[in-house]
Design a protein with these regions (language model features):
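Core catalytic lobe of class I
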Residues: 1-265, 269-271
Length: 273
């Protein structure tokens, strides 16, 4: 594991920001006071949505967060917004799409709408199919400057097939052609959830909503490169920051809850030395 040094990043002459560190603060306040324009390569976060997640009684100011994220994101940078919708009286809120439209309104491109599909979701509904997914909106500031596609084996990996190849004599000649061994993944990503699926860090589940470490890693590898800055403005128990650090990216983790920041710090202690 590459051990990154803590680097001073002078975004505010009065408050030098240290990379690879956690901060207890309200994220809009933190961004306004500490992060320069066009300085973040990738933001990966999962905000509290509707009233499904009780976030220690704190207020979630979505519009201000979105505006600040646009300001601090580099040209070509990406924001991955992992979010779901409340279902009340059989009616989905669609808050996720309302938020996506607002991101688009303030200047982001909606580069992709991806699906985080949960393999073993415990939630059952009596009069509808089990709700087992969340959205992963990929917003970009212009065209993404980085895309490292994740590959997966093809169904017919290593097989050959006969194809018709018309030669100079205008006759079809059948030739063997080896099929591609791998392909780029689709935008529906499947993950097991719960202890052993989401993470093996038991302390992480003191936070009400933890997404899988592999999900975080897949996005970090896709939309950033080594040495880039990965930001999580609502870092909770620190999954984004942990996986950024372990993949040789710099991270900034912010959360308004001191309790959650302590959990995040403890998860990284074994790696940071």
């Amino acid at each position: 594991i590459f051990m990154q040094a803590q680097i001073e990043y002078d975004v505010n002459p009065n408050i030098p920001l240290i990379l690879n560190n956690f901060y207890v603060d309200e994220c809009v306040n933190f961004m306004k006071n500490n992060i320069m324009d066009d300085s973040i390569d990738l933001t990966l976060t999962s905000p509290p949505y509707d009233n499904l997640r009780i976030y220690n009684g704190f207020i979630f100011n979505f519009k201000e967060i979105a505006i600040e994220l646009y300001r601090i994101t580099k040209k070509g940078g990406v924001v991955v917004w992992v979010v779901g919708d409340k279902i009340k009286n059989g009616n989905k809120s669609l808050t996720s799409f309302k938020q996506a439209l607002y991101f688009q309104k303030i200047g982001f491109n909606v580069h992709d709408v991806m699906i985080y599909a949960k393999k073993n979701t415990p939630f059952m509904r009596s009069n509808a199919y089990t709700n087992s997914y969340e959205y992963m909106f990929v917003f970009s500031k212009g065209k993404p400057k980085t895309f490292n596609p994740i590959k997966e084996p093809t169904v017919r990996n290593g097989m050959e097939m006969l194809v018709a190849n018309k030669g100079s004599d205008a006759k079809n000649n059948k030739v063997l052609k080896e099929l591609k061994k791998e392909k780029t993944k689709s935008n529906i990503w499947y993950y097991a959830v719960g202890l052993g699926g989401t993470t093996n860090d038991k302390e992480a589940f003191q936070h009400p909503a933890v997404y899988p470490e592999q999900l975080a890693l897949d996005h970090i590898l896709s939309w950033s490169n080594e040495g880039d800055i990965v930001f999580d403005p609502m870092c909770g128990s620190g999954t984004t920051c942990k996986m950024a650090f372990l993949s040789n990216r710099n991270f900034i983790g912010v959360d308004i809850s001191e309790e959650y920041i302590e959990i995040a710090k403890n998860r990284l202690k074994k790696y940071k030395g």
